[in-house]
Amino acid sequence: MMGICEMKSCCSWLLLISLLCSLSNESQAISPDGEALLSFRNAVTRSDSFIHQWRPEDPDPCNWNGVTCDAKTKRVITLNLTYHKIMGPLPPDIGKLDHLRLLMLHNNALYGAIPTALGNCTALEEIHLQSNYFTGPIPAEMGDLPGLQKLDMSSNTLSGPIPASLGQLKKLSNFNVSNNFLVGQIPSDGVLSGFSKNSFIGNLNLCGKHVDVVCQDDSGNPSSHSQSGQNQKKNSGKLLISASATVGALLLVALMCFWGCFLYKKLGKVEIKSLAKDVGGGASIVMFHGDLPYSSKDIIKKLEMLNEEHIIGCGGFGTVYKLAMDDGKVFALKRILKLNEGFDRFFERELEILGSIKHRYLVNLRGYCNSPTSKLLLYDYLPGGSLDEALHERGEQLDWDSRVNIIIGAAKGLSYLHHDCSPRIIHRDIKSSNILLDGNLEARVSDFGLAKLLEDEESHITTIVAGTFGYLAPEYMQSGRATEKTDVYSFGVLVLEVLSGKRPTDASFIEKGLNVVGWLKFLISEKRPRDIVDPNCEGMQMESLDALLSIATQCVSPSPEERPTMHRVVQLLESEVMTPCPSEFYDSSSD
């Protein structure tokens, strides 16, 4: 009898323990929000380590990187994963985050369609998907988000029309679909009618009053929905380059370029023959907004006639040729070898955007030739060559006024990229060989956008390979992440190069274990900063020099926060260098 009781007691304890274990396991089960986030993580093919911390072993997603939860409900309300090199599709399970208010996935490498399930996240107030590679149509279901206030899908490869349902978003105050492949008439009803042209530019096949393009019906006549009496216009709005992280391998391109230059020097006409064969093997010409008044046949014929005498340079992005047309106009042709066919679509899209950017102090991209193995970029040809050549390779010396004007021109070009483009453009490779000069020695910034286009995952390494080591900001060397302030640092180095007439890593600096920035700091400590100036520079004005040294010193500050913006730099140049007042820089350095 006692045995039976003991058995019953034992079974009761086992049942209780089993129940407690079951309850314990249930309490540790991951939440539905966590499961949705893990679905997203599992879809990612590549990223930095930011979301590696998301693990099913940690059942509380509120502790995960980039995730914020409501304190009471413990539901996910914010997902912020910007600038983390995330590559992969956005899975439909994202729609299960029905308490989500803020979705920030911009500046990554997400691709594929935007899931229609996003329309299930009815608590959303802000969606930021810009600067990715999303394709396909904009889901009409996004019009089912009653609380949505901000929607940014700019700088992707979205196609199709803009859904009319978005006009129902009564709280929408910020809307941007610029720089995509959207087509058709922009909905004129509802909230979308209140947004400006900047929300839609960069979509060449959109029409409507927002972009000053009259819509046509199927017969080719102006649509009855368009304003009467308005002539059809081409969309002349500026296409703005994305800060999107395009796939590329600058290291590979640089090595190919150097190898191409080696072949040119050692094997003579081998590269030229391959270029002629490449162009003759099925090339097509893309012109931007009628900038090239020539037929494709005429241009290809000229390309086939290029020989080794037309090579005028070989840099980090490719070999450069001088191309003369029959009407006397001259262009610079930059040859960039293709990386892979999948890269073409994004590359061509970015080239189209670059080709639309026009400014007095920028080198214009007129079009390109798409050949089987390379892209041939057609730029304006500037007879003055590069600033690097003017400073270091020619017999004649630049006088003071010329140097100051070059500095101001370069500053204005870079300031335009930083402050007058949306999204802002980071050059990433400011150096003297990327500052070109016209016949009057007026400066123009070249190669903007290419460093980002061909960016390798280890971008700081590829830039060093390209020969710009002396221009890199210290934080860029450490992190590889470029910002406007890394450009400002490079500009400060450029100013010192122009003033000294020496390259940033001149042998005279290296012997002392310094570069031009270190040399300036040494001279300041010795209370003789003016000694940095090229002794062969004629017409120097001391007050302007002191102002320039002060600006350069601010630009090359070790702390990015202490560097001025390029807009501020231009203001200082115009107020203190062009019309100098007595400077305190030299006095403060001489105390």
Swiss-Prot record:
Short name of any one Pfam family annotated for the protein: Pkinase
Post-translational modification: Autophosphorylated.
Glycosylation sites noted in the Swiss-Prot or TrEMBL record: 80, 120, 176
Localization per Swiss-Prot or TrEMBL: Cell membrane
Binding-site residues for ATP, renumbered to this chain: 312-320, 334
Protein kinase domain residues: 306-578
Deletion phenotype: No visible phenotype. Fei1 and fei2 double mutants exhibit disrupted anisotropic expansion (e.g. during hypocotyl elongation), impaired synthesis of cell wall polymers, and abnormal cellulose biosynthesis.
Catalysed reactions listed for this entry: L-seryl-[protein] + ATP = O-phospho-L-seryl-[protein] + ADP + H(+); L-threonyl-[protein] + ATP = O-phospho-L-threonyl-[protein] + ADP + H(+)
Membrane side Extracellular: residue ranges: 30-238
Gene Ontology terms, MF aspect: ATP binding; protein serine kinase activity; protein serine/threonine kinase activity
Sites bearing Phosphothreonine, chain numbering: 462-463, 468
Residues modified as Phosphoserine: 386
Keywords, ordered alphabetically: ATP-binding, Cell membrane, Glycoprotein, Kinase, Leucine-rich repeat, Membrane, Nucleotide-binding, Phosphoprotein, Receptor, Repeat, Serine/threonine-protein kinase, Signal, Transferase, Transmembrane, Transmembrane helix
Its biological purpose: Involved in the signaling pathway that regulates cell wall function, including cellulose biosynthesis, likely via an 1-aminocyclopropane-1-carboxylic acid (ACC)-mediated signal (a precursor of ethylene).
Name used for this protein in its record: LRR receptor-like serine/threonine-protein kinase FEI 1
Organism: Arabidopsis thaliana
Taxonomic placement: Eukaryota, Viridiplantae, Streptophyta, Embryophyta, Tracheophyta
Gene that this sequence comes from: FEI1
